[in-house]
Amino acid sequence: MTNAPDTHVMAQRPRWRLFLRVLAARLDAVLDADQRDALLRDVGADMARGAALPPVSTLDALEDEINEVLSDLGWGRASLALDEAARVLSIVHTHLPTIGSIEGRRGPWLSAVLEGLYTSWLAQQPHAAPGLVARRTARRTKDVLVLTYGKASAMTDSPS
């Protein structure tokens, strides 16, 4: 038996966790929560442009395209459901990596990035209405985040 590390297992491990925790701490130190979230939404929007989704004609196809990119990122999965009565799209995102700052609690620090990512991806689709945004509306468990895509004026305060 050898004590050599299993390179396949090592390749599967996240290698950015310490960097992201230190970056989170630095951002938390120089920005208030609203500024930090705005910056992270912009990062998500930039990511959406870098990983643009093809135009699709069904919600199921959109969910598949989103999940393909999320899988490549190692950022979990999304389930999409249209709430016709409320005129919003519900996004249930599971298994987002939990990154917090060194000093802060661990949690969905990257959720603001998801807001920008989903806002931009959905806006890129054919027949997308202008001015709609994705915002966190609930957290069911540590690794389940619910976002709503709709008019900003209809959104309630989002949980941190």
Model regions: which residues?
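Short, hydrophobic/π-rich interface segment
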Residues: 84-140
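N-terminal accessory segment detector
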Residues: 1-90, 95-109, 157-160
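C-terminal edge-of-domain segments
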Residues: 136-158
